[in-house]
Amino acid sequence: MQIKLANPRGFCAGVDRAIEIVNRALEVFGPPIYVRHEVVHNKFVVEDLRNRGAIFVEELDQVPDDVIVIFSAHGVSQAVRSEAAGRGLKVFDATCPLVTKVHIEVARYSRDGRECILIGHAGHPEVEGTMGQYDASNGGAIYLVEDEKDVAELQVRNPERLAFVTQTTLSMDDTSRVIDALRTRFPAIGGPRKDDICYATQNRQDAVKQLADECDVVLVVGSPNSSNSNRLRELAERMATPAYLIDGAEDLQRSWFDGVERIGITAGASAPEVLVRGVIQQLQAWGATGADELAGREENITFSMPKELRVRSLL
């Protein structure tokens, strides 16, 4: 058995920044540091930060007064921001800047009196935060659609004053079909100048397609609640390549590799490389050889830290 590695894979710039914000806050201010929602959707990362003194909560009413709170990479609604400000909580915002871009678009549509359609998955924290940027007090509305069926059933108030945005971690192929359905049903609909699906999601989906084309089975390292990791598994499966989503080496089953010659490995944007290395080691212990990276797109994007943490960390 030969191992092939997708390129790129694993951490993106937004995840790197979010984890570093929690780490630096712990270094500068000391524990406990409260984090609203898992800062990124990866069990290993969250457990490591928890062991260092981060406390993860789902709502601000679980946070005591006079503590530091970090908003996760997925972003929060305006209501959550107002609640934190009203309580005087000290907040560091780890929202991915590419998610913030979508938030700004939604807020602009709201101010302009345009209804907004969000393409995304119900219940995902990014979707909840994005929908919470729309102020419906002026009579507008924001709608959530997941697929073409939702588009066909959607009733809007004014199809001439309509715009769409998307969750950043969706399948590019699925989203393209939904956008086509929206443009067919609502010809006047507006949208972002550039696709809202982030560069890291696009790059990892392109890479897993190449991997699935060259391998007999694909392993996606990522947690079950990671949207982008699930999309990678789905993409490989659509190419008729068996694919498994695993948190790490402990989830591997030897029977998956019966009769397999080429094993492909990728990782979601919130999965650290140490987990990939653990998977490689286990496969090599079972007789697999090599760990060759496929040619891929180089990523050199970085996002700046909040000023206070950046300055303090240099003292």
Curated annotation (Swiss-Prot):
One GO MF term attached to the UniProt entry: 4 iron, 4 sulfur cluster binding
Chain positions recorded as dimethylallyl diphosphate binding sites: 41, 74, 124, 226-228, 270
Record organism: Pseudomonas fluorescens (strain ATCC BAA-477 / NRRL B-23932 / Pf-5)
Enzyme category, top tier: oxidoreductase
The protein's annotated pathway: Isoprenoid biosynthesis; dimethylallyl diphosphate biosynthesis; dimethylallyl diphosphate from (2E)-4-hydroxy-3-methylbutenyl diphosphate: step 1/1; Isoprenoid biosynthesis; isopentenyl diphosphate biosynthesis via DXP pathway; isopentenyl diphosphate from 1-deoxy-D-xylulose 5-phosphate: step 6/6
Family: Belongs to the IspH family.
Protein name in UniProt: 4-hydroxy-3-methylbut-2-enyl diphosphate reductase
Chain sites annotated for binding isopentenyl diphosphate: 41, 74, 124, 226-228, 270
Keyword Iron-sulfur belongs to the record: yes
Function text: Catalyzes the conversion of 1-hydroxy-2-methyl-2-(E)-butenyl 4-diphosphate (HMBPP) into a mixture of isopentenyl diphosphate (IPP) and dimethylallyl diphosphate (DMAPP). Acts in the terminal step of the DOXP/MEP pathway for isoprenoid precursor biosynthesis.
Keywords annotated in UniProt: 4Fe-4S, Iron, Iron-sulfur, Isoprene biosynthesis, Metal-binding, Oxidoreductase
Binding site for (2E)-4-hydroxy-3-methylbut-2-enyl diphosphate: 41, 74, 124, 168, 226-228, 270
